[in-house]
Structures are given as structure tokens and as C-alpha cells.
């Protein structure tokens, strides 16, 4: 079974569709206040049989900042796709965002380790990477110090990646992807979609 956090977001909703379409059994985390209409719209975009596929998703209420709910949700899970994160460039959201993103990722990593999850895929951000020189190739070994001039969001993603790498040192099989601006069908008008307002 595959566990997905951030399932109600842009990347997460499309990921859910592709995982379900591939025959995977899914457990998706959502907040009790989440509106699933956006996820349904993404499924509707991809297929006429959207409702059948959507109804195959097992949903669980929880929050990445609640370790106990994650520990329970990851029991019997083989793979985790962790995409839940708060995105904000409002300085007033700094502490909430740092807590949600860093502590939330630490909780996901710890629950995965505790329950013997086979693999974790963490959806980070290009914001977490050091600046690169023109035409420089970035590999898995490219990891430097966090440049302080970046945003609080970048800091939260960088420090979240540190939690994932800590997990790998403790035996977790994990990968990190660092998307930049993510565009595609059904894009909401927040996050990358805000560029189109």
C-alpha cells in the first residue's frame, strides 16, 4: 500500500491519479477540513471514469504535525510519497510554516522508520538548493549550506530535506525531488498558479 501526504494539493492530486491508475492501493492523508472537490476535478480532467478511480482512494484524517496519527497511518505501508507542506511568503507565517514543514517531515520520516516503510519519496523544492553556476549539473551529491538570503519557505524545505537525509542515515530508503515552478492542467490560483493572476 502507498501512503500520500499533500494529496489535496496540485502535485498530490495528480500523483494520486497516476498512482491509482497504475493499480496501486492508496491511503491518502487529508485534514478533517479538507475539501476534496479539487482532487475530483483533477481526476475528472484525466478520465471519464474519474469517479470509479477516485472512490478507490482510502482517505484518513490527520496532520503531518501529529506524530501519533502518522504512526497509525503508516502501519502496513510499503511506500510513502510526502508532499504535504505549507507554502507562504508572508513573514507572519514563518513559525507556523517552519513547524509544519520541518516538524511534519521529521514526523513522516520517524513514522516510516518505526513502521519499516520500504521507501520514502519526498517532494521538496528547487528553493532548497544552493545557487548553481551557469550550466552546472546538479547530482544527488549536490548539497551545500543553506544561503541565509533566501526565503523562509526555502529554509523550511532545506531543513526538511535534512530530516529526510537523517532518516537515510538511520536506514530509511529515501529519494528527494526538487521541482521548480510546477504547471499543468487544473492548476489552482495559489502556489505556482499565482503567476497567472
Q: Where do the PLM segments sit?
A:
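N-terminal Rossmann NAD(P)H-binding glycine-rich loop of SDR-like oxidoreductase domains
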Residues: 2-24
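Glycine-rich phosphate-binding loop and adjoining beta1-alpha1-beta2 segment
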Residues: 30-52
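NAD(P)H-binding glycine-rich loop region in Rossmannoid oxidoreductase-like domains
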Residues: 44, 48-100
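Conserved sequence/active-site signature of Rossmann-fold short-chain dehydrogenase/reductase
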Residues: 65, 128, 182-184
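Active-site beta-alpha turn of Rossmann-fold NAD(P)-dependent dehydrogenases/reductases
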Residues: 84, 121-124, 180
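Conserved Rossmann-fold NAD(P)-dependent oxidoreductase catalytic core, especially the SDR/UDP-sugar
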Residues: 94-95, 100-152, 175
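Active-site Tyr-X1-5-Lys
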Residues: 149-175
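NAD(P)-dependent short-chain dehydrogenase/reductase
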Residues: 168-197
Amino acid at each position: 500500500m502507498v501512503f500520500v501526504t499533500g494529496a489535496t494539493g496540485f502535485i498530490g492530486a495528480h500523483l494520486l491519479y497516476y498512482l491509482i491508475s497504475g493499480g496501486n492501493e492508496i491511503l491518502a492523508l487529508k485534514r478533517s477540513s479538507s475539501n476534496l472537490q479539487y482532487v475530483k476535478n483533477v481526476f475528472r480532467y484525466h478520465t471519464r471514469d474519474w469517479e470509479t478511480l477516485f472512490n478507490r482512494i482510502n482517505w484518513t484524517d490527520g496532520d503531518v504535525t501529529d506524530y501519533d496519527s502518522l504512526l497509525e497511518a503508516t502501519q502496513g505501508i510499503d511506500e510513502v510519497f510526502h508532499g504535504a507542506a505549507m507554502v507562504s511568503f508572508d513573514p507572519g507565517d514563518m513559525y507556523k510554516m517552519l513547524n509544519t514543514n520541518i516538524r511534519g517531515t521529521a514526523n513522516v520520516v520517524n513514522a516510516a522508520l518505526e513502521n519499516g516503510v520500504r521507501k520514502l519519496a519526498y517532494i521538496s523544492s528547487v528553493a532548497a538548493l544552493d545557487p548553481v553556476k551557469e550550466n552546472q549539473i546538479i547530482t544527488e551529491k549536490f548539497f551545500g549550506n543553506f544561503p541565509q538570503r533566501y526565503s523562509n519557505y526555502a529554509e523550511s524545505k532545506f531543513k526538511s530535506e535534512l530530516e529526510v537525509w537523517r532518516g537515510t542515515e538511520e536506514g530509511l530508503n529515501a529519494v528527494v525531488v526538487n521541482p521548480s515552478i510546477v504547471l499543468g492542467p487544473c492548476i489552482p490560483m495559489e502556489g505556482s498558479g499565482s503567476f497567472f493572476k
